[in-house]
């Protein structure tokens, strides 16, 4: 595993050692030998097939005679060897191995299931397997035996089946796979629905959605809406999957927006915090799509509802609402945004004291975007108030919060000019609290970076004349941060 392709010069010798293990009378030794070949083939891809020639025949014979776990290991070994072969040989071996794979689809053994899925992934990528063959011979059994509720409860198998479905879609096309996933999307079992949404999002992310006809689009959106409405777990995959499909459809989403937004607005007033959180998260993802569809009235309506929800008491939900508002600010014409920016910002300032990580990051990002896009709509006094709140966040134990606070501080300094901010920061260097002095020194460095060192240096050098150790140390720290930034 550590050597990877560096194993190639030693393959011949290793195969000489391993080949007798494939015909050993003890089952565990045959299994270990086959697993070793599978690992070596995987590591040496796409080279080294000549070294494996001596084990092909015993593997081939073993595949026809063995059953159970031994067969699973032999299948895994041959499955990893096929990608190393020339197209002609690969086609022949693929055709033969697929017969065994088809036969073993209904095996109850988990090891066999994993081996079958691995072989299917490898064979789908070879030229010998045609889309027609996969649609007619493989897909029906694959969906019948693997797309079942029990698979959704096994985390490892769940991921394998989802990934194999995405690989299969590259050969048979997105419409065929999505058509077969509509039933699991509507299933009563939530883990099964979640698994189906993960698969749909992988397929759409991989191949796009251009090939879907109008009827299939309607059925897909309907099924995703059902999955979203029925969700009771914390899995973010459902609304993210919905977002991937909506983003792929883009302007084709326009006919579906009204019912979707109606459901989101109902969910934002739901008694369950989890439902409200997921509704706000989906809202954040859909806002760029709403903008692309030209539904600006709908965007303003959403913005008003989100603004009215800022009194949310659950921090997880509040963080998602702030994220959605941030998305709305990015996608709107700020001169026409409702409610206006000068009404939104004073409402946000008290929320800066909330020390929940998700709230901190999202509120700072939202204020930073407003400071970058429309600073003139907010009074300088309000920006100064926000600057002092941000100073506290510069000493946050969370690195992501500190980084976002730094960027936002710089945006505000650019918006209102460095003079007022610098006066307040330089005064902070005289206080007794060390942490505040360090944060102020960092902030001075950020102001210098955002507005240019020439705006900050004269004031800093003037302040350095103050015969106070704290002030002088603070100025030196600020200079260090300025050079660092």
Regions found by a protein language model. Give the residues of each.
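Hydrophobic residues within the alpha-helices of tandem HEAT/HEAT-like
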Residues: 1-4, 22, 36-44, 62-63, ...
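Alpha-solenoid helical repeat scaffolds
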Residues: 3-10, 44-48, 70, 89-90, ...
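HEAT/HEAT-like alpha-solenoid repeats
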Residues: 8-22, 48-63, 90-104, 131-147, ...
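A generic tandem-repeat structural signature
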Residues: 10-11, 28-30, 36-44, 52
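Short inter-helical turns and helix N-cap capping residues of alpha-solenoid HEAT/ARM repeat scaffolds
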Residues: 25-26, 66-67, 108-109, 150-154, ...
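Long, helix-rich interaction regions
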Residues: 156, 161, 313, 400, ...
């Amino acid at each position: 595993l550590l050597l990877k392709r560096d194993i190639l010069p030693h393959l011949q010798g290793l195969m000489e050692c391993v080949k007798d293990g494939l015909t050993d009378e003890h089952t565990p030794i045959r299994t270990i030998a086959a697993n070793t070949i599978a690992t070596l083939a995987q590591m040496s891809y796409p080279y080294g097939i000549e070294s494996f020639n001596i084990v092909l025949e015993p593997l081939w014979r073993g595949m026809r005679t063995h059953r159970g776990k031994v067969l699973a290991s032999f299948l895994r070994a041959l499955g990893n060897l096929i990608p190393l072969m020339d197209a002609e040989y690969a086609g022949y071996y693929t055709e033969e191995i697929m017969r065994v794979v088809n036969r073993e689809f209904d095996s109850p053994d988990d090891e066999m299931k994993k081996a079958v899925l691995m072989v299917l992934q490898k064979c789908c990528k070879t030229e010998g397997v045609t889309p027609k063959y996969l649609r007619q011979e493989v897909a029906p059994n694959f969906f019948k035996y693997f797309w079942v509720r029990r698979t959704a409860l096994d985390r490892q198998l769940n991921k394998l089946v989802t990934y194999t479905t995405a690989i299969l879609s590259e050969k048979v096309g997105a419409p065929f796979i999505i058509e077969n996933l509509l039933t699991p999307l509507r299933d009563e079992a939530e883990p099964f629905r979640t698994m189906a949404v993960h698969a749909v999002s992988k397929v759409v992310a991989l191949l796009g959605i251009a090939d879907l006809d109008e009827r299939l689009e309607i059925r897909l959106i309907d099924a995703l809406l059902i999955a979203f409405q029925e969700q009771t777990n914390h899995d973010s995959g459902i609304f993210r999957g919905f977002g991937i499909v909506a983003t792929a459809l883009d302007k084709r989403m326009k006919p579906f927006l009204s019912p979707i937004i109606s459901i989101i607005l109902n969910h934002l007033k739901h008694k369950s915090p989890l439902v409200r959180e997921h509704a706000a998260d989906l809202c954040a993802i859909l806002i760029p799509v709403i903008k692309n569809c030209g539904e600006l009235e709908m965007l303003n309506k959403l913005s008003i509802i989100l603004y009215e929800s800022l009194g949310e008491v659950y921090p997880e939900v509040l963080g998602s609402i702030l994220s959605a508002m941030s998305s709305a600010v990015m996608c709107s014409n700020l001169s026409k945004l409702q409610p206006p920016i000068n009404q939104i910002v004073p409402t946000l300032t008290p929320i800066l004291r909330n020390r929940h990580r998700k709230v901190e990051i999202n509120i700072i990002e939202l204020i930073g975007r407003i400071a970058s896009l429309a600073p003139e709509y907010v009074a300088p006094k309000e920006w100064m108030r926000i600057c002092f709140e941000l100073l506290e966040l510069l000493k946050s134990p969370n690195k992501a919060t500190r980084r976002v606070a730094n960027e936002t501080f710089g945006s505000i300094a650019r918006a209102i000019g460095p003079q007022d901010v610098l006066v307040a920061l330089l005064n902070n260097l005289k206080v007794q609290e060390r942490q505040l002095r360090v944060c102020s020194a960092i902030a001075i460095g950020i102001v210098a970076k955002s507005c240019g060192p020439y705006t900050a240096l004269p004031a800093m050098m003037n302040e350095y004349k103050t015969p106070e150790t704290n002030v002088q140390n603070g100025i030196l720290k600020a200079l260090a941060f300025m050079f660092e930034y």
